[in-house]
Amino acid sequence: MTIHRADLLLPGAGRAPVPGGAVLVDGRSIEAVGPYEELAAARPAARVRRWPGVLTPGLCNPYGPELLEQAYHPDPREADELGTEPLTGAALAALEMTESRWGASARRGVRRMLAHGTVAVAGRLRRETVADAVARSGLGFDERFEDPQGPPALDPLAGGRPVEDAFVLPPLDFEGRQADFAVFDVPGLSADGDPYAALARAGAASCVATVLDGRLVHRRA
């Protein structure tokens, strides 16, 4: 068992913030949510991970197809030639793309998503190698009934999207919930301030840790 504690916990679904909150993870599930002191007293033998900032449900990126099937994420070895940012449009059309290359690009794209607190993507993936890369990563799939507004972004909070709209449901305190959550090092967090506004300003690039299915899949160096 592991207790993940943070300065503030946002359970999601309109639940009240928990200062000094924590989640108790047992395998792939969240066993308990609440103030750290209560969880530590109930499970004194549990391992403890201390994170700065805000612990929230993991995020859903609404641009699954756009970021993984309509963009190429360069290999670091290609940085001198192609740069480091995703390539789209004419730059993508100029590349010789094979199924193997699409799969490798998707794996790199998934890693970048995990580094933004993403635990699920929305939108149907039609390319088999891309869908396989996402499935193997453990990312969840959400249905999408209309195209999202604004340009595709690795940050699910970009473009003024309400923070709670980006949270994957159910809330963290839902009984038996899968252990998918993220932690964001939000500057300027205060006891009397609005944590949602602070997180929106910081953006998902402030992610310091992402836990997917109980596994720590991203940790900022």
Regions found by a protein language model. Name each.
Residues 36-44, 131-136:
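Short loop/helix-cap segments at secondary-structure boundaries that form the rim of catalytic
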Residues 1-42, 165-203, 211-221:
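N-terminal metal-binding scaffold of metallo-dependent hydrolase/deaminase domains
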Residues 116-155:
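Active-site loop-helix segments enriched in His/Asp/Glu that coordinate
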Residues 66-128, 157-159, 166-172, 185, ...:
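Divalent metal-binding segments
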Residues 1-2, 46-50, 54, 145-148, ...:
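Short, well-ordered secondary-structure micro-motifs within conserved domains or adaptor modules
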Residues 112, 133, 175:
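Hydrophobic/aromatic ligand-binding patch that stacks against planar heteroaromatic rings
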